[in-house]
Amino acid sequence: MKKHSIRLIALMFLACCLTSAVGQKRNKYEFERNLPVYADSLLKDLTYPLAWGHSPIKSFKKWKKVARQKVFDCMLAPPPAPLPKPYEVKVLCEEQREGYKARKLEIRLSRYYWVPAYVLIPDGKGPFPAVNALHDHGGHLFIGKEKMIRPLACEDSTVIKDADEWLAGYEGQFFGDYLARHGYVVFSADAPMWGERGQKEGAQRNKYDMIAGNMMMYGIDLSAYMTYDDLSGTEYLASMSEVDASRVACVGWSMGGYRAWMLSALSDRIKVGASVCWMVTTDEQMSFKYSRTENGGFANCFPG
């Protein structure tokens, strides 16, 4: 009798848990599959009045100035500039590689935080052209800059192993190291939530949207902070004595491709931008045909 009672209690507890997990339903509702039921109407109302070709501004130079300011307005408040001086840098370690030097840095891009980064500098006499290499999302937050540049020997063995495993999907080629061997200074920094800018509790992709929402409560935007850091990182790169500031480019794929086109649009430092495999449209991504199902959508979302 006692066994049956315990079993019955366990089954009732399981039933309650399943009910909570599935969620109670009402006959009427307003949201479906992570979207409001009127999502298609919202898409029809998006006319993009400031888009080039739609805008009444016909001078590209004037349009660029107005459109750029609109983007900055949507990005909300920037991180406060560092004090007492910009681009305070700590060199954490350095090593010689075949044809170039590799350094791990921490750069003071804001009064709030330091940003970990790698920089590769070709041997020989500069100044050299430079590339800001912007890492992807990939659903993998444990590494960031290490997706673009081979980790230095001073890194933890788990980081080196993880980067090598990630590289298997790219035919074993670290893109940044390839560029450095061909005469480019290469810079790559961790975006917020990636690599050494992640969570104390460990990389948890399913927490991304929650953290982004919490940051909005402070009047700031997580995706915008990523873009602000890319802008500041590019300014630091252009300020290096080894760099020809008139020949600075950026490149990235997936989320890095998004970062590349934002950086190209917002910085006059960038002379060439390459956005690789960044090809979704709002009409597809935010419709019932596709619908967002993964975490991390805030990585490319400004409030405006």
Set out the residue ranges of the language-model regions.
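Bacterial Sec-dependent N-terminal signal peptides
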Residues: 1-27
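N-terminal cap/lid segment of alpha/beta-hydrolase-fold proteins
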Residues: 73, 77-126, 130
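N-terminal pre-domain segments of enzymes
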Residues: 24-73, 77
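Glycine-rich nucleophile elbow surrounding the catalytic serine of serine-hydrolase chemistry
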Residues: 252-262
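Cap/lid segment of the alpha/beta-hydrolase catalytic domain
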Residues: 126, 133-228, 239, 286-287
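Alpha/beta-hydrolase fold nucleophile elbow
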Residues: 242-254
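Mobile cap/lid helix-loop segments that gate and shape the active-site cleft of serine hydrolases
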Residues: 210, 216-217, 232, 272-304
